[in-house]
């Protein structure tokens, strides 16, 4: 096996997704240790990143979700320290965290995305409701794990929802409702893995459904996708990742409309690795267990 030296599993951090990061990090740490890797937990909220060098770490497995973790900040710090790390580089991480600018790139390249509008204090909210229709989704551009995602149903409600959300990270986006199903497709080292059909018991795949409930159904391989649709989803996931320069292990989320058309929703350049997480479920279908998946991701560690 490749010699990774002393490995820091970066977990926790400062964002609203701290607890999820700790859960993922603990699972990864245990998996790496089970494979004989000299791995240790490292929480930047408790210990400055500069201590990585002082403590002799040679590789970083980054599982810091959200702000300062997957937005390019910690990636830049690791570049300066010269420590190889897993995941995407600075630019791709920053773009992937910004749903608005990621959508602009995908649109420019002709990839299918749901129609959307960026909201501001002076937005004509009635006009946006008319353009996108109801219901619609409203979300902050730079939060993850469905933090701040609201389904707007009632006419005239858009402005008040915007006022509730505008303190969150990034622009606030209103997005056309696509009602044919929710899917996700991981990409590992430029190769699409089996897609997952997500069937939440809640109204949509929100934070509660992702992390706290046990009644969300995950179909992998998906029972309602034809072979051609599955192939297209994987192709679009790979193209979506390549469009922003994402590397290593990422996950692209999709919506399907009632006519069967697939839309790229967003990309997660640092997907979760908990017992509820989608990437391990998809990898398992291909015969790759959790510990082996962690090793494959660790092999992608890089600088620059």
UniProtKB/Swiss-Prot annotation:
Pathway info: Cell wall biogenesis; peptidoglycan biosynthesis
Q: Where in the cell is it found?
A: Cytoplasm
The free-text cofactor remark is: Binds 2 magnesium or manganese ions per subunit.
The protein's required cofactor(s) are namely:
Mg(2+); Mn(2+)
Q: Which reaction does it catalyse?
A: 2 D-alanine + ATP = D-alanyl-D-alanine + ADP + phosphate + H(+)
Q: Which residues form the ATP-grasp domain?
A: 103-299
**Binding-site positions, Mg(2+) 1:** 253, 266
Q: Provide the binding site for Mg(2+) 2.
A: 266, 268
Q: Might you name a Gene Ontology BP term for this protein?
A: peptidoglycan biosynthetic process
Residues annotated as binding ATP: 129-184
UniProt-listed InterPro entries: ATP-grasp, ATP_grasp_subdomain_1, D-Ala_lig_Van_CS, D_ala_D_ala, Dala_Dala_lig_C, Dala_Dala_lig_N, PreATP-grasp_dom_sf
An example GO CC term for this entry is: cytoplasm
Which class of enzymes does this protein belong to?
Answer: ligase
Q: Which domain of life is it from?
A: Bacteria
Query: What Enzyme Commission number does this protein have?
Result: 6.3.2.4
Please tell me where this protein is predominantly located. Answer: cytoplasm
MF terms from GO for this chain are: ATP binding; D-alanine-D-alanine ligase activity; metal ion binding
- Print the keywords alphabetically: ATP-binding, Cell shape, Cell wall biogenesis/degradation, Cytoplasm, Ligase, Magnesium, Manganese, Metal-binding, Nucleotide-binding, Peptidoglycan synthesis
The cross-references to NCBIfam families, in alphabetical order and at most eight, read:
D_ala_D_alaTIGR, PRK01372.1
What does this protein do, in the record's words? Cell wall formation.
What the record says about family reads: Belongs to the D-alanine--D-alanine ligase family.
Instruction: State what protein this is by name.
Output: D-alanine--D-alanine ligase
Q: What is the lineage of its organism?
A: Bacteria, Pseudomonadati, Pseudomonadota, Betaproteobacteria, Neisseriales
The gene that this protein is the product of is ddl
């Amino acid at each position: 096996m490749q010699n990774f030296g002393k490995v820091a599993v970066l977990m926790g951090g400062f964002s609203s997704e701290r607890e999820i990061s700790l859960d993922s990090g603990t699972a990864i740490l245990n998996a790496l240790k089970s494979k004989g890797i000299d791995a240790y937990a490292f929480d930047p909220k408790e210990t400055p990143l500069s201590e990585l060098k002082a403590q002799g770490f040679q590789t970083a497995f980054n599982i810091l979700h959200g702000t300062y973790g997957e937005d390019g900040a910690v990636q830049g710090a690791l570049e300066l320290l010269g420590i190889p790390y897993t995941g995407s580089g600075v630019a791709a991480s920053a773009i992937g965290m910004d749903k608005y600018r990621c959508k602009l790139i995908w649109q420019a390249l002709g990839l299918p995305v749901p129609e959307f509008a960026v909201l501001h204090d002076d937005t004509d909210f009635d006009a946006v409701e008319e353009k996108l229709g109801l219901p619609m989704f409203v979300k902050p551009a730079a939060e993850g794990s469905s933090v701040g995602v609201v389904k707007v149903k009632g006419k005239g409600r858009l402005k008040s929802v915007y006022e509730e959300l505008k303190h969150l990270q990034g622009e606030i986006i209103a997005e056309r409702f696509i009602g044919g199903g929710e899917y996700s497709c991981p990409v590992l080292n430029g190769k699409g893995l089996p897609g997952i059909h997500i069937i939440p018991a809640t109204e949509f795949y929100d934070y509660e459904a992702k992390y706290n409930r046990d009644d969300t159904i995950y179909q992998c391989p998906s029972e309602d996708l034809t072979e051609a649709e599955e192939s297209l989803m994987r192709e679009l996931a790979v193209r979506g990742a390549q469009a922003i320069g994402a590397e290593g292990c990422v996950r692209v989320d999709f919506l399907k409309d009632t006519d069967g058309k697939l839309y790229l929703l967003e990309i997660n350049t640092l997907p979760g690795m908990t017992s509820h997480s989608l990437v391990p479920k998809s990898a398992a279908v291909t015969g790759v267990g959790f510990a082996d998946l962690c090793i494959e991701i660790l092999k992608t560690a890089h600088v620059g």
